[in-house]
Amino acid sequence: MQKETQFNVVLDIGKTNVKLYLLHKNNSVVKIFKTKQKVHFYKRKIKLLDAPQLIDWFLKKLKIISKKHSLNKFVCTAHACSLAFIDEKDEEIIAVTDYEYQFDKFAKEYKKILPSFNKTYTPLLEGGLNLGQQIYFLSKQFPEVLKKTKFILSYPQYISWKLSNTFSSEISYIGCHSHFWNHSSSKYSSIINKFKIRKKLPKIRKAWKIIGKIKINNKVLKILNGVHDSNASYLYFKNSNLKNFTLISSGTWYIIFNQKTKLKELKANLDMLCNIDVFGNTVPTMRFMGGREFDELIKKLKITAINRHSITKDLLKKYLIYPSFASAGPFKKSTQSLNLIKKLSNNEKYGLVCIYITFVLHFCLNVMNSNNNIILDGPITKNNTMIKILSSLRSKQKIYIHSKEIGTGLGASILFNIKKKNNLFLTEVLPDNKINYEHYYDLWFNQIKEKKLVNIPRG
C-alpha cells in the first residue's frame, strides 16, 4: 500500500501581512493563504496585535487543508518584539504587544538601568523595539500585568503554546535587539534579574524542536517551537554550503546580516546590533525600514502607473531624496520638502525612490564593512531597478539573487529537516553602468553629513 503524502505548514507573521504556507515535503509551495494583522487594546489604552483572532483564522484554514491533505509538521515564524503575557490559569493577559506603540515613554529612566552596549550589542530603540523597554513600561504603567504573569512568551512561542500547550522560549527571538541577552557571556543579561522575570521566561528550546501535537480533523500535526522571522531567512542560506556572505533580507525591514563584521565595529546610534542565529551563533546586523519607506514615498509622491524608471544624469543633478521616512535606522526623520519632486513624471519619481532606498542600503553595507558576496532575498529581488543600481555601486562584490524568493516563510521550512543542507540556485545581478551612481551617492552622502542627518545616540 502506497504511503500517503504528508504536507507541512508554515505560519509566517509579518508586521503587516500574514501568510499560511502549505508545503510539500520537499518544501515546494502547494498553496498560500493570506491575511493582515488586526489590532485590539488592553484596557482601551495599549494597542496590541490581535493574535487570538489570527489563531482563529489559521485554525479554520488548517481544518480546510486537512480535509484534502495529510499534515505532518507546523512551525511559526514571526517578526520581533511582540510578547504575550500568560497568567496562572493559562489565560492571556496580553496577546500580543505591538512594537509601534509608544513603549518608550520612560526611555530616559530605562536607559539608566541598561547593561552596556558591549554586552547586549543592542541600541536603545524607539517605541517597543526593545523587549526590555516594553517590560519597563508595563512595570510603571500597568504593574498588575507583571504581577499576574506566570509566563512571558515571544510571538512564535505564543502560537506554538496555543497549539501544543507547551511553554517555550527560543534563542533567535530572545536575542533579537531585546536587551534580554548578554552576547559576551551567552546568558540572560543583568536586566532580567532587575525586572525579576527570570522564572517567567520558559525553558529555551531549539527552534526545530517538536514540543507537542494537535489534532486537526483527527489528523495529528506536530508543532515545532518556532523562530524569529529574519533569522529564518538567514537560516536558509546559512544551512547551505555557502561559507562567507552578506545577506540582505527585505520586507517592511531591510536587514543586513554579515558574520564577518566584528562586534566591536557595531555602532548603537546607527541601528547596528547583534542577532543570534538558531544555532546560538552571534550575527552582526544592521537595519532600516526600507519597505516601509518605499511604500511611504510611493504614497507621498502619488506614484501610479509605473512602466519603467526614468533616471538620467540631468534628473540626478537636480533632485535627490534624503532620509528618512520611517522610524529606526541610521538616519534622522526627514524634513525635506518633496513639492518639487511631486511635479515630476511617475517614472522619474519612481526612479528617485529606487535610488534613495538603494543609497541607504549602500551606506549600510559600507558601515558593515561588507566585502564578501551579497545575497538578496525578499521583495527587493523583484525590483530590477534597485538591484542593478546596487550592483553598480558595489562593483568590487558579486551580488546574487536566488532563483526563487525565499523570504521568512520558506526559510522557516528548513526547520522541518534541519540536518539537510540546501542547494542554492543563485543568479548574478549585472550592474547598470549607464550612469556613474557612485558619483551621485557621494553628492548625496556629503549632503547628509552637511545636514547632520546621521543619528546621534538615542536616550
Where are each of the predicted segments found?
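Active-site phosphate-binding/coordination module
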Residues: 68-131
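Active-site core segments that coordinate phosphate-bearing ligands/cofactors
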Residues: 2, 19, 111-124, 130-150, ...
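Short, acidic/turn-prone active-site loops that include or flank metal/cofactor-
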Residues: 34-40, 97-104, 252-254, 403-407
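N-terminal glycine/serine-rich phosphate-binding loop of ATP-dependent small-molecule kinases
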Residues: 1-95, 148, 203, 219-225, ...
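Nucleotide/phosphate-binding loop and acidic/charged catalytic motifs
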Residues: 74, 169-175
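Glycine-rich phosphate-binding loop of ATP-grasp-fold ATP-dependent ligases
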Residues: 93, 173-180
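A conserved helix-loop-beta module that forms one wall/lid of the active-site cleft
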Residues: 193-209
